[in-house]
């Protein structure tokens, strides 16, 4: 009950902010994947609706994401949208299986330094993603972005009830429409759908060849989706100082991806940027996620003419705020005080994610380096004594015996 009705006002207002911020991202991710914008937008409202009821991390926002979209490019290019929908269904099945196998518990093997590196890298990527909107533009865009940041950071001193990102979007949209400013808007990103989605089945042959085509894509999408979702859940846990059910989250991601595929949407996962917006705007319960999905549906179907007028500069200001708030500034100061090995893991995670734009590669690199570092440390904490008694030698071992410490017997 507390998850639903404990933070009604904050959840509703935060959900509205998230819904507005989701629209351009969903369109952008659709373009990356090579599909029509409505595919990403259908996912952007369907997945949050499902996650609100079944998710294991209240206040976390899931939708179509860039990491998932990148994995879909080749499949869409070679085989088309229908195979993507089929792959999204199989992705959901894999995630359901992972949830029932309790693979969410594997998150305890991800060190804090890897999580910090993941957060910092994502903050950098979020900021970098805004740069195209700030290059080769008129001075109006810079002025509106600066004004938006001013509203976001100064409005809380006047009123903390209404989320400042929402005020930023409303005010800048009003100014742009009133002054008829020549700035890029949400409508310039792509056409918004003008009708509700309908139930459909992927139009693909039900045979072994189809399975062999979609299987590798589905496996990759399932792994990346769960990895990003589990990492985001951990971050929201820290921000709200509350626990989450990782295995329930795995199952819910699977259900959500299956459902969105049956209405023509693409597979998705948790979004750290939108989750941070939600939490920082006051969202704490499941109602915030539900509100985001419902409001987004209403916006794109019934209020699309108004939504299309939102200047991208307003959303850029919101995302820059997210980037600044997401980055762990304390980790820079901790480079002097933390052990070198911990800092190396964090920096390596950041470097790989930023270089490849692939969160999974970065996290796996960080986990690998952390594991090697742990194995090296453990191998040092082993003492071997031996006693020769006639023709036999007796060894007494204190510590862990494994491949890295085996040379102590020689």
Residue positions per predicted region:
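Transmembrane helical cores of multi-pass ion-transport proteins
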Residues: 1-373, 378-382
């Amino acid at each position: 009950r507390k998850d639903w009705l404990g933070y009604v006002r904050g959840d509703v207002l935060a959900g509205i902010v998230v819904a507005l911020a989701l629209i351009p991202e969903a369109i952008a991710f659709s373009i990356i994947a090579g599909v029509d914008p409505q595919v990403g937008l259908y996912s952007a409202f369907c997945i949050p609706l499902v996650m609100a009821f079944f998710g294991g991390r209240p206040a976390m926002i899931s939708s179509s994401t860039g990491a998932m979209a990148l994995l879909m490019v080749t499949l869409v290019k070679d085989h088309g949208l229908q195979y993507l929908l089929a792959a999204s269904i199989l992705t959901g099945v894999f995630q359901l299986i992972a949830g029932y196998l309790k693979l969410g518990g594997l998150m305890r093997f991800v060190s804090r330094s890897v999580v910090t590196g993941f957060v910092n890298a994502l903050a950098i990527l979020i900021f970098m993603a805004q740069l195209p909107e700030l290059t080769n533009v008129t001075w109006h865009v810079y002025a509106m972005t600066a004004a938006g940041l001013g509203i976001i950071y100064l409005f809380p001193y006047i009123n903390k009830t209404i989320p400042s990102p929402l005020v930023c979007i409303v005010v800048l949209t009003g100014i742009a429409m009133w002054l008829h400013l020549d700035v890029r808007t949400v409508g310039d990103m792509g056409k918004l759908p003008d009708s509700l989605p309908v139930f459909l089945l992927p139009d693909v042959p039900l045979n072994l060849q189809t399975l062999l085509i979609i299987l590798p894509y589905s496996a990759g999408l399932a792994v990346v989706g769960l990895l990003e979702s589990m990492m985001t859940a951990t971050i929201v846990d820290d921000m709200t100082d509350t626990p989450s059910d990782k295995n329930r989250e795995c199952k819910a991601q699977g259900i959500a991806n299956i459902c969105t595929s049956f209405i023509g949407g693409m597979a998705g996962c948790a979004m750290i940027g939108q989750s941070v917006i939600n939490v920082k705007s006051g969202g704490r319960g499941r109602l915030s996620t539900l509100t985001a999905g419902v409001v987004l549906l209403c916006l794109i179907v019934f209020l699309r003419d108004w939504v299309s007028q939102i200047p991208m500069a307003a959303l850029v200001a919101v995302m820059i705020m997210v980037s600044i708030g997401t980055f762990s500034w304390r980790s820079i100061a901790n480079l002097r005080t933390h052990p070198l090995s911990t800092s190396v893991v964090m920096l390596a995670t950041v470097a790989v994610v930023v270089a490849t734009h692939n969160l999974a590669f970065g996290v796996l690199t960080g986990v690998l380096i952390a594991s090697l570092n742990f194995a090296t440390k453990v191998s040092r904490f082993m003492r071997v004594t031996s006693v020769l008694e006639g023709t036999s030698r007796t060894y007494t071992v204190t510590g862990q015996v494994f491949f890295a410490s085996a040379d102590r017997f020689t």
